[in-house]
Curated annotation (Swiss-Prot):
PANTHER family according to UniProt: HISTIDINE--TRNA LIGASE, MITOCHONDRIAL-RELATED (PTHR43707:SF1), HISTIDYL-TRNA SYNTHETASE (PTHR43707)
Keyword Ligase: yes
Main location (coarse class): cytoplasm
A single GO cellular-component term on record: cytoplasm
Cross-referenced InterPro entries: aa-tRNA-synth_II, aa-tRNA-synth_II/BPL/LPL, Anticodon-bd, Anticodon-bd_dom_sf, His-tRNA-ligase, HisRS-like_core, HisRS/HisZ, HisRS_anticodon
Protein name per the record: Histidine--tRNA ligase
UniProt cross-references to HAMAP family, sorted A to Z: His_tRNA_synth (MF_00127)
Species annotation: Synechococcus sp. (strain RCC307)
Subcellular location: Cytoplasm
Record text on subunit structure and interactions: Homodimer.
Length: 414
């Protein structure tokens, strides 16, 4: 019978890797706790309309990359391709904004039908924050600072923050008209994807990876030239806030985000730790999204990080599997019957305990215990089972002592 394999782009996380993931997730969780950001968990499966309305039907995500299907009730459903729209939907549905502004974080798997490559899979994992109901430019600064500080806490090196303002809706429409007019006169010089985007999502042309298109864009109208005075002042306040925190930034007038809901502040944090610059965090402000999804008008800002990309940057040494504290070794029927009860007692007092159930001789079991990195081995033979006196061996020094089974938990000293 043919061996079944995981689907392309759907990667198993094996035990050797999960300890590193747990460390990363716990580091982020503690970072968010100290920033007074509460966790929210949303379903993996949502109505397709949520993303069509929230992200934008003209985006690559909605047009090309979503996993969508009709369920048995003929409802169009989609595996979430990103987290923001789901968080906003949940906040609206459960009236969170009626309770005041919300500082939320989320984490978990997302799904996009893309070509798998290093740091990017079809099932991928993100963590992100969403500040809902915060209009002050200082909230943009704080959100960026939280991302920057988390990346530094994780040990990511070579960080660079790129910053832009997409302005208000009116600013973007003014710029869109100017850009479309300029590019239409040079349409034959654009790559095929950019020619298609000219009619559907022209701002995304600024993010083209085609070298010829990027060369052409050097002379294109600049988004900053279309900013109104209030938008320009807001942008200056964000930059001043970052400078006050000594967070270095580079203004990039070509920086746009791939989702339609962004406006005003947009940013990406990259790292050159792997050689080329790789984006590790992206986000910005999305003041119109809550209202667009049927909620009250609310100013919002947030960001997301891809965990697979972070794992590549962290390398193999970021966190190793934790060894057991104790390995319980037994030989003989009476002794083997005690092995699991002894392990259970030790676990109840906080020890990490492995039980060797191989049935091999004491020598082989002790050798395996030593290789495991454990500090202690508890040896139980039939004689120990009969007397109730167990052997405790220090695997670092080789010293042994006896300890009474009846008072094992009370007398155990690590």
């Amino acid at each position: 019978m043919e061996q079944l394999q995981s689907l392309r782009g759907m990667v198993d996380l094996l035990p050797a890797a999960t300890s590193r993931w747990q460390w990363l997730e716990q580091t982020a969780r503690e970072h968010f706790r100290r920033s007074c950001i509460r966790e929210i968990r949303t379903p993996l499966l949502e109505a397709t309309e949520l993303f069509a309305r929230g992200i934008g039907e003209a985006t690559d995500v909605v047009g090309k990359e979503m996993y969508s299907f009709n369920d048995r009730g003929d409802r169009s459903c989609t595996l979430r391709p990103e987290g923001t729209a789901s968080v906003v939907r949940a906040a609206i549905q459960h009236g969170l904004l009626s309770q005041g502004a919300q500082r939320l974080w989320y984490g978990g798997p997302m799904f996009r039908y893309e070509r798998p490559q290093g740091g990017r899979q079809r099932q991928f994992h993100q963590i992100g924050i969403e500040f809902l109901g915060f209009a002050d430019p200082r909230s943009d600064v704080e959100a960026i600072a939280i991302a920057w500080d988390l990346l530094e806490a994780l040990g990511i090196t070579g960080l660079q923050l790129e910053l832009n303002s997409l302005g208000s809706r009116v600013d973007r429409q003014t710029y869109r008209d100017a850009l479309v007019g300029w590019l239409s006169e040079r349409q034959n010089q654009l790559d095929a994807d950019s020619q298609q985007r000219l009619a559907t999502n022209p701002l995304r042309i600024l993010d083209s990876k085609n070298p010829q298109t990027q060369q052409l864009l050097q002379d294109a109208p600049n988004l900053e030239q279309s900013l109104s005075d209030p938008s320009r002042e807001r942008y200056e306040q964000v930059k001043a806030g970052l400078s006050a925190l000594k967070i270095p930034y580079l203004c990039n007038p070509r920086l746009v985000r791939g989702l339609d809901y962004y406006g005003h502040t947009a940013f990406e944090i990259t790292s050159d730790a792997l050689g080329a610059q790789a984006t590790v965090c992206g986000g910005g402000r999305y003041d119109g999204l809550v209202e667009q999804l049927g909620g009250p008008a609310a100013a919002c800002v947030g960001w997301a990080m891809g965990l697979e990309r972070l794992m590549l940057l962290l390398g193999d040494e970021s966190q190793q599997s934790q060894p057991p504290d104790v390995v319980v070794i037994s030989q003989g029927n009476a002794a083997e019957a005690l092995a699991v009860p002894v392990a259970r007692q030790l676990r109840q007092i906080g020890q990490a305990v492995d039980v060797d159930l191989s049935g091999a001789g004491f020598g082989k079991q002790l050798k395996r215990a030593g290789k495991s990195g454990a500090r202690w081995a508890v040896l139980i033979g039939d004689e120990e089972a009969s007397s109730g006196q167990l052997q405790r061996k220090d695997l670092h020094s080789g010293d042994s002592s006896t300890i009474a089974l009846q008072s094992l938990a009370e007398n155990w000293i690590s």
